[in-house]
């Protein structure tokens, strides 16, 4: 979501990494969405009604979310001028960098907060600025899909911030998130709802 000076999240970038490279598997994305929705609904004890997608790119999560919950409210943010210009109106994508969430509160706290495949590209200073805002805006579960230096992953390594998994765990816990596993984190508002063995 943060763009180094020489890295552009333009049409070519999304085509290369999300279409041509074959990394965008629709069935896999649907399973991921179902996992996140199920976790949030389990802890909220009701269907989700609101989603905030930070670093949403072209809003790939939006269609599978709406297929599961047609009435939910979806709001996406991304730093890509291309994604905002091309899909802003039709997919509810607005401009913002990750660090903007130090002050940006675009909606009431949401049932499901998504920040998928973003945080491992955000420089540490900006990460520390924006992360508390994510905790404040999450009333249910956050899906924070992040790769650490221990991971061998396929995809874009340009701008990858090689930080150990324990670094992320500490940062997420410091703002009140509780680990649930599979990239899901329980919001600070609900941490008392989980038993000791549910929390990772």
Regions found by a protein language model. Give the residues of each.
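Class I (Rossmann-like) S-adenosyl-L-methionine-dependent methyltransferase catalytic domain
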Residues: 1-106, 122-200
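A conserved beta-strand element that flanks and buttresses the S-adenosyl-L-methionine
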Residues: 114
């Amino acid at each position: 979501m943060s763009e180094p000076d020489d890295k552009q999240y333009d049409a070519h970038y999304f085509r290369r990494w999300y279409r041509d490279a074959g990394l965008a598997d629709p069935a896999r994305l649907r399973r991921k969405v179902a996992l996140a929705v199920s976790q949030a609904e389990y802890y909220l004890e009701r269907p989700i009604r609101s989603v905030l997608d930070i670093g949403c790119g072209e809003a790939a999560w939006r269609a599978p979310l709406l297929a599961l919950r047609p009435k939910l409210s979806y709001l996406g943010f991304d730093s890509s001028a291309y994604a905002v210009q091309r899909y802003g109106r039709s997919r509810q994508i607005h401009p913002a960098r990750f660090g903007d969430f130090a002050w940006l509160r675009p909606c009431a706290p949401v049932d499901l907060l998504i920040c998928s495949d973003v945080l491992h590209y955000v420089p540490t200073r900006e990460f520390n600025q924006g992360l508390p805002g994510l905790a404040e805006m999450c009333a249910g579960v956050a899906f924070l899909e992040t790769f650490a230096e221990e991971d061998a992953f396929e995809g874009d390594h340009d701008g990858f911030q090689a930080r150990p998994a324990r670094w992320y765990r500490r940062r997420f816990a410091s703002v009140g998130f509780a680990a649930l596993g599979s990239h899901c984190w329980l919001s600070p508002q609900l941490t008392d709802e989980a038993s000791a063995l549910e929390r990772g």
